[in-house]
């Protein structure tokens, strides 16, 4: 099949960008002809791809595809709405970001939510539309994320909560919650990813985003994240308990609970 993928950005080791990396890699390994269109393609993520082409906007309007899969429709739909594709799938990664609102168009054949709460969100948004909505979780490389590779190093004695992901307004209140709790329960919080805030706390350490993020799963006892997203599932795959936060669109905490 000739497949076009489209997302807002393809450059960082984070969330939906890694989703499209995993998806494009899986399609390419299965023998498909895979292209990815994004207005923002750059290192370091682009360097991790192999056999994937990155066409321009003019190029995609001239081609015909068997399948088009896209996200971040509030922006990307304007670029791809005239693409000639036999089947179009809108994948939604968030129920709180305006960027991720499902596109309501007769051209869409299928909607996909990456967790149950997003499926409910899509159904509410598209209303009486008869288009199908499916739950398909994030794709993962289980050779990287598994209990054996995630086993904590015996040399690390501190109790550590790993808090991966971009530290933006959606994760700021959960971080404060963890740091307050760390003072009562004596643990360290290790953040890995982009950091939009200056946070100074004796129990807090932050690291730059890295490709080999699994090395940090070997250092922790517990993984924490927002929603049932990439970091939560990576933690579960590595055999960790996961403390999950659900937040609203302003980043206020709605619910705190365990997965294990």
Predicted segment positions?
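A short, glycine/small-residue-rich beta-strand->loop->alpha-helix junction that serves as a flexible
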Residues: 7-19, 168-173
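Catalytic binding pocket for nucleotide-activated donors in carbohydrate/polymer assembly enzymes
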Residues: 230-260
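Short His-centered aromatic/hydrophobic patch
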Residues: 70-75, 92, 227-228
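Short acidic alpha-helix that forms the nucleotide-activated donor recognition element
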Residues: 63, 209-220, 233, 237
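Conserved catalytic-core segment of nucleotide-activated headgroup transferases in glycan assembly
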Residues: 142-144, 150-200
